[in-house]
Amino acid sequence: FDVFTKNGEIYGFPFRGDYYVMYYNKDIFDAAGVAYPSNDWTWADFEETAKKLTSGEGANKIYGAAFHTWQACIQNWGVQDGKHTIMDYDTGYDFFKPYYEMALRMQDEGTVQDYGTLKTGNIHYSGPFAQGTVGMMPMGTWLMSVMIQKVKDGESNVNWGIATLPHAEGVEAGYTVGSMTPLAINAASAKQDAAWELVKFITGEEGAASYAKNGAIPGRSNADSIAEIAKMEGMPEDAAEALTVKNISLDRPITDKVGEVNQMLGEEHSLIMLGELSVDEGLAEMAERAAEIVG
């Protein structure tokens, strides 16, 4: 509730939570003779393994990994340790730098598909992974239900697994990035009492159980709800361990001007990934523009 509290007032109750994990294609790992990811991988492990998984050329190429085009799929790793947020522009956003360097390095080496191709093709975030053309992809827990349904409907035959999100050296395993979705009551509502009963139900234990049975992580998450999700038909083995995390840093803090800053970070992200700005130039522009936005 602290996330949705300001000046002592609660402005919303969390009913759903999502966070990033790492999806992987077991068949691609098996074909390369590489052991499946553990729940204590570093980003260096991720990058090195992507090289081992990459194979083929042209239309038959298998990419070792994938980063979707959202800026979150690079910038989130900079706030994963909980020490910074996207509003910490006074640092010059230096905490993003290692991850931009990693992504560009992998792009140059051909172990991930290049940003420009994904962007111009307007490729859905689930596309490359569901098609079986990438070995690993960091993505939110919302993809679990998507993959279950795609496999069930025959749209995908990927033999997939999940692992806890990789972390930086010196950061404890189980640290990830995510967000909470709140429910709130309109102050102008003529049915405040009825709305409150609905909010209590959805954000309470019964609502949490219902969300878990449908593969969504409830705001009121605990070992029981994780176990419920993990035993769903179509979920990979050992999912419960991968989903048991120690800390979830917010991808976007709830504060003034965060929406405008986030939009700006997306614009600069594209310029860096397309090579129109160097990493240092892009980070400097981010910091300068964020300071102007916040005022």
Model segments located where?
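Extracytoplasmic/periplasmic substrate-recognition and gating elements
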Residues: 32, 109-112, 150-217, 277
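Pocket-flanking alpha-helical
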Residues: 1-12, 23, 47-59, 73-78, ...
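Glycine-centered hinge/linker elements that transmit conformational signals in sensory
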Residues: 50, 88-119, 165
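Alpha-to-beta junction loops
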Residues: 131-139
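Long, aromatic- and glycine/proline-rich binding clefts that accommodate carbohydrate-like moieties
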Residues: 163, 213-267, 271
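Short helix-initiation/N-cap motifs at beta->coil->alpha
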Residues: 41-47, 116-131
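A local structural motif
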Residues: 33-38, 104-120, 133, 153-159
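Hinge/lid segment of periplasmic solute-binding proteins
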Residues: 1-19, 159-163, 231-234
